[in-house]
């Protein structure tokens, strides 16, 4: 059970097993805190691979002791798990847990020393995992509930936290949850173009996907939300996902059924498809599901509950950025691009072996015709639409060659409240360190240049952004579906100073993206909505229109971070 990821995931499982034996002893609250620590540890592994320079000022001896203690904790957690799987006596259970607690105290002492010697490192890797009471007081309000998921090889868990209570539920094992999530993901993204597919083949594939969609969506909704259906009402949902669930568009899931306590069978309680956005909305007959979750709920994703509390501490009292928005869009990826000075391009047309960025693109499922990246035609319109909403002198538009890595790493970005990247963003789950944003790969003369904003680059940025938008993310769900690519990128921007990040879970149709972004930015800049509320309003409005009703066109965009 104790995997490479870390000891805390194993410890959470142990505590939940103890909770089943001793439900009055608050083991479920301790397990939630362990789950929060596990997420901080997972991020550290990503950053180590990315070679992000975050360990400056930390005594190497302390880091060695930290690693040694983690190994001891892993071994002890394994032994305790084996013990609990049998028929241990009460004395055996108490003794084993005391040994584990003793090691945990020593581990926390080492972490405290690291925190003292390097506050920056500690703030990132140990974001002060909150107790249950702290989560309730610092993260939640009366209109919000926290849903935190943890997947394990033998079983998974869901914690539902309100300002006044905690409830915990056992979920199926990781393999079962991920198989259900994968099926839903494949069906919701079926509208994606498939290379070399004929019109007839596409029509047949879409018809099959549409026929299977409702059943798959209902199955996943029942699995993930069924146990808590009666608790959700119309509250804001703060979702801390795990593994494959990071790529589940919760916004598109149908409202969950109310679980029948007697039979265990989940049935759908007939409910109106209401919304606070409009007084009398009606269900969309064109939609493959009757009433998606987004209609009744604002949905916010979080790397962890503790990260949000840390974000709020970092942002408290920060002076607002002076300017409104900067948009980097429609970069130049290829020496064959029509925007290049042809003479200079011919002189530099040298064959290069596949670069690390191109290999990462292949791992992330980006369809490419030959070397290079496809131009995203509608990103230019996307940029123009956003800029039309901005007062003169309060925005900047960086198109073509100006949409460069140099521009993205410039201190000038710190002047803007909203930062929008309308270009390929790679979420690489096989090698999270290779996640990043693709900007102009050639200059005006056609000379190759470094245009990849890498994960470790983000940790050196100094932003004052209320929001960073990545409107064209792309990923591939490999055999092992993990969320490290998404977590690394969004957490990196938060570390750099962004209060929230909007990213896409798949490459959405260019035209649909431009349309959704138009509605999203109108909601923020014209109507004065908070980003989370503006995104929800844009998604609901897309769902209600026949042309855009399929969740593929709107559900892939998720907001991570602060919702206020």
Q: Which residues make up each language-model segment?
A:
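Amphipathic alpha-helical protein-protein interaction segments
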Residues: 1-260, 284, 288-296, 301, ...
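Residue-level detector of buried hydrophobic side-chain packing
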Residues: 38, 147, 158, 237-239, ...
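An often Trp-containing, charged/polar helix-loop segment at the C-terminal end
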Residues: 273, 314-319, 324, 511-564
């Amino acid at each position: 059970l104790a995997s490479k990821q870390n000891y805390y995931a194993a410890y959470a499982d142990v505590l939940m097993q103890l909770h089943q034996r001793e439900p009055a002893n608050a083991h479920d609250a301790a397990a939630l805190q362990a789950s929060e620590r596990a997420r901080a540890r997972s991020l550290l592994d990503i950053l180590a691979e990315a070679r992000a320079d975050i360990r400056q000022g930390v005594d190497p001896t302390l880091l060695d002791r930290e690693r040694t203690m983690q190994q001891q904790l892993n071994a002890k957690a394994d032994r305790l798990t084996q013990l609990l799987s049998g028929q241990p006596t009460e004395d055996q259970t108490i003794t084993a847990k005391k040994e584990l607690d003793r090691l945990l105290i020593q581990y926390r002492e080492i972490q405290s020393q690291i925190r003292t010697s390097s506050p920056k490192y500690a703030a990132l890797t140990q974001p002060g995992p909150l107790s249950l009471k702290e989560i309730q007081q610092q993260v939640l309000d009366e209109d919000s509930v926290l849903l935190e998921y943890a997947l394990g090889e033998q079983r998974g868990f869901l914690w539902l936290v309100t300002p006044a209570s905690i409830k915990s539920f056992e979920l199926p094992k990781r393999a079962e949850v991920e198989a259900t999530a994968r099926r839903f993901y494949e069906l919701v993204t079926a509208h994606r173009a498939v290379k070399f597919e004929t019109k007839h083949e596409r029509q047949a594939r879409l018809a099959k996907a549409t026929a299977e969609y409702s059943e798959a969506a209902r199955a996943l909704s029942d699995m993930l939300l069924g146990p808590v259906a009666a608790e959700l009402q119309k509250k804001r949902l703060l979702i801390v996902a795990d593994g494959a669930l990071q790529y589940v568009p919760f916004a598109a899931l149908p409202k969950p059924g109310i679980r029948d306590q007697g039979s265990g069978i989940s049935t759908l309680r007939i409910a109106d498809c209401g919304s606070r956005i409009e007084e009398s909305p009606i269900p969309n007959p064109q939609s493959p599901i009757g009433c998606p979750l987004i209609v009744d709920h604002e949905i916010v994703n979080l790397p962890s509950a503790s990260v949000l509390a840390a974000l709020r501490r970092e942002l408290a009292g920060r002076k607002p950025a002076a300017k409104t928005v900067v948009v980097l869009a429609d970069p130049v990826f290829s020496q064959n691009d029509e925007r290049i000075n042809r003479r200079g391009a011919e002189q530099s047309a040298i064959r290069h072996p596949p670069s690390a960025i191109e290999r990462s693109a292949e791992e992330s499922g980006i369809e490419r015709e030959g070397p290079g990246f496809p131009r995203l035609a509608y990103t230019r319109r996307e940029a123009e639409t956003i800029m039309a909403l901005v007062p003169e002198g309060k925005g900047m538009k960086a198109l073509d060659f100006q949409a460069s890595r140099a521009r993205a790493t410039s201190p000038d970005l710190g002047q803007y409240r909203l930062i929008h990247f309308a270009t390929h963003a790679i979420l690489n789950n096989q090698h999270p360190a290779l996640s990043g944003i693709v900007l102009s790969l050639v200059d005006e003369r056609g000379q190759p240049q470094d245009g990849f904003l890498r994960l470790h680059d983000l940790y050196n940025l100094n932003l004052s952004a209320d929001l960073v938008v990545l409107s064209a993310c792309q990923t591939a769900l490999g055999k092992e579906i993990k969320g490290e690519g998404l977590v690394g990128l969004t957490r990196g921007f938060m570390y750099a100073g962004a209060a929230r990040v909007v990213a896409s879970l798949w490459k959405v149709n260019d035209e649909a993206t431009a349309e959704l972004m138009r509605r999203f930015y109108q909601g923020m800049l014209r109507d004065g909505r908070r980003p989370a509320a503006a995104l929800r309003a844009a998604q609901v409005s897309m769902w209600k229109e026949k042309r855009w009703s399929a969740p593929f066109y709107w559900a892939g965009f998720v907001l991570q971070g602060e919702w206020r």
